[in-house]
């Protein structure tokens, strides 16, 4: 293997290892184990045949439109779970592995697409070390899985696999639509990916290939929606999958409400500023992105495939979320847009007429990204951490070692409302028996006391 090939192999491998270590550091002491994580990991602990035909419930009612999240989580439980006693933080490690694999693939894809290692590294560091993303990326949580799959599908487009084979089209489409299965907010990234595949072929003059790819994409989406159709046909009383979305659109189309374009822009701007700007959150950051988008639109106007995975998903999201009526959206709705947004930012900043100047700017952006990483990592450590998890784990292990059943488990320390002090104990093989004589009391130092 020559030196150049070795470098091209080592860099993504190191990227995977470093980003994974960053995400899972201390996870067995602070894993965020609330209602959603308990529900989804409980499902993953069961047999594949018992998995739901639809995705997790949403906080606005209904559920996501397919079971891909549960398929992947079940596979994580089978492959990764046994190494960690099938405890839920093992699921978090598995999900972090998916995220880090997506980061490594995206780095390679940007490198190949732009021909610049500096652009690839700068983009990857900015995406990976975003504090809010870092805080959530090792959870058992469907929005983050959706973001990871959308990231992988974006990478497939950047390396041009869909333009070279029908298998590439089908695989990329399946990844993109599985991201929507995991989290509906990924639909804008998925649509951008679909447009990129078809528009790229049209731009090359391959109209037959473009039409064929569109048919393949439609077929993949149709096949992936079969579980939803089966679920709805077998559950006559089941609510619609995305009732809040269809209800909002219906109210606007009927004239009962108006699209909220200003609120949608503010939601996107606030999310981008927080995700990419925290802990500082400078108000000017969104305008740097907007300026970069204009530069990218001009410079790459003859490259619709690239524009469709960078600028288009952001435009679609701002327009699409304007048709949502209700309290506006949480920042995590926008995670799947961040790879395209960051790549837009970096490509815009490095759009110099001279390649040497462009490379110098990219190297400078990388230096800035590396310089702000420690502050971002520190800020991430202040969000979505549950130190009680470590205390629950220590006490549950000690209780199981003693080998007798208990009436229930209580804690000497307060827990978040939706946490379950008995969940880890049950996974480890402990028995809850209502007729048992004692209730166990877990303490902060991992000790166990008994109360009648």
Residue ranges: model-predicted function:
Residues 136-137, 284, 305-357:
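Hydrophobic/aromatic-rich transmembrane helices and adjacent perimembrane loops
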Residues 132-145:
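Short acidic/glycine- and proline-prone juxtamembrane loop motifs at membrane-interface regions
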Residues 112-114, 153-171, 179, 349:
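Membrane-interface transmembrane helices that cradle and orient dolichyl/undecaprenyl
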Residues 22-26, 37-64, 68-71, 75-80, ...:
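Extracytosolic helix-loop segments that constitute the early lumenal/periplasmic catalytic or substrate-binding loops
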Residues 43-46, 190-292:
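Transmembrane-lumen/periplasm boundary regions of multi-pass, lipid-linked membrane glycan transferases
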Residues 13-16, 218, 349-378, 388:
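Signature aromatic-anchored transmembrane alpha helix within multi-pass, membrane-resident enzymes
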Residues 123-124, 168-184, 195, 318:
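Membrane-interface alpha helices of multi-pass inner-membrane proteins
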Residues 93-114, 149-152, 292-299:
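Transmembrane-helix motifs of polytopic, lipid-linked glycan transferases
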């Amino acid at each position: 293997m020559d030196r150049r090939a070795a470098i091209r192999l080592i860099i993504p491998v190191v990227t995977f290892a470093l980003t994974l270590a960053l995400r899972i550091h201390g996870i067995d002491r602070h894993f965020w184990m609330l209602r959603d994580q308990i529900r989804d990991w409980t499902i993953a602990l069961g047999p594949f045949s018992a998995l739901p035909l639809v995705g997790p419930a949403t906080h606005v009612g209904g559920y996501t439109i397919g079971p891909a999240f549960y398929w992947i989580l079940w596979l994580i439980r089978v492959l990764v779970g046994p190494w960690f006693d099938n405890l839920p933080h093992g699921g978090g490690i598995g999900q972090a592995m998916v995220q880090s694999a997506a980061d490594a693939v995206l780095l390679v894809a940007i490198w190949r697409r732009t021909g610049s290692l500096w652009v690839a590294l700068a983009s990857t560091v900015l995406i990976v070390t975003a504090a809010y993303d870092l805080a959530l990326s090792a959870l058992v949580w469907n929005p983050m899985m959706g973001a990871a799959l959308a990231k992988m599908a974006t990478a497939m487009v950047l390396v041009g696999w869909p333009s070279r084979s029908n298998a590439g089209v089908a695989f990329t489409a399946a990844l993109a639509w599985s991201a929507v299965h995991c989290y509906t907010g990924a639909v804008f990234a998925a649509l951008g990916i679909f447009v990129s595949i078809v528009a790229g072929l049209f731009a090359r003059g391959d109209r037959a290939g473009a039409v064929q790819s569109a048919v393949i994409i439609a077929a993949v989406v149709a096949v992936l929606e079969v579980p939803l159709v089966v679920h709805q046909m077998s559950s006559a009383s089941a609510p619609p999958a995305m009732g809040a979305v269809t209800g909002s659109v219906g109210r606007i189309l009927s004239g009962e409400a108006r699209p909220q374009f200003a609120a949608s822009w503010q939601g996107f701007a606030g999310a981008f500023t927080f995700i990419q700007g925290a802990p500082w959150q400078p108000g000017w950051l969104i305008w740097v992105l907007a300026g970069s988008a204009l530069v990218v639109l001009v410079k790459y106007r003859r490259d619709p495939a690239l524009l469709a995975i960078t600028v288009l998903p952001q435009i679609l999201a701002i327009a699409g979320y304007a048709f949502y009526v209700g309290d506006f959206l949480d920042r995590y709705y926008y995670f799947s847009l961040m790879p395209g947004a960051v790549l837009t930012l970096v490509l815009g900043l490095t759009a110099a007429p001279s390649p040497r100047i462009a490379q110098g700017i990219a190297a400078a952006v990388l230096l800035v990204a590396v310089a702000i990483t420690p502050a971002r990592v520190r800020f991430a450590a202040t969000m979505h951490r549950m130190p009680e998890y470590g205390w629950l784990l220590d006490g549950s292990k000690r209780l199981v070692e003693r080998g007798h059943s208990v009436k229930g488990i209580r804690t000497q320390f307060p827990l978040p409302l939706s946490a379950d002090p008995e969940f880890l104990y049950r996974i480890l093989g402990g028995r809850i028996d209502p007729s048992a004589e004692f209730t166990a009391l877990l303490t902060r130092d991992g000790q166990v006391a008994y109360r009648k």
